[in-house]
Amino acid sequence: MKKAEFGQLPMPVQDYLLYLEAIKGHSELSVIEYASDLRTFFRYLAKEKDLYPPDTPDDQIDLRQINMEFIKTVTLSDAYQFLIYCKNQRGNAEATRARRVIAIRRFFIYLTDNRHLLEENPMKVLDAPKTKKALPKYMTLEEARHLLSVVDGKHKERDYAILTLLLNCGMRLSELVSIDYNDIKSNDTLVITGKGNKER
């Protein structure tokens, strides 16, 4: 999903996405993930609640017609059915379903606590599926040395520097590609802006 497509979402969702970026300070990528998860949820509901026939292709569902009156009809059971649909029909992994739960739950918190558009939050007790925490994969010192020793090619100095940063700092790829010349301080240190706009 692209930010330019936000105008195709229900107006309450559009307002929520603005709130996430302007007030909560979420990154554009995080806001796009919330938008995508909520779009999937409301497309599912549009078919389940008979706004559209069940066989309607997702891209032909006009979500702009979904308003607060429709949202007030959404129940906890609807969310559970949506998660079953995500697992069985969409083949979503536990982590994806857990992320979708967070998006739905936080959207309804916003409607209830921030905007006071709902008297009760139907998603208050919506739990995320348990996800398995995999141990991080790592290289041995010998493997890391070997990797650095085989760097070759036209941009070998650049590639060597990139690999050295990744190996020694444990930064994410997104953090690496977002490094700007101004991030390098006068004392030869580098400030990385990571997930959640946290500097380290």
What annotation goes with each model-predicted range?
Residues 1-200:
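Conserved catalytic core of the tyrosine transesterase superfamily
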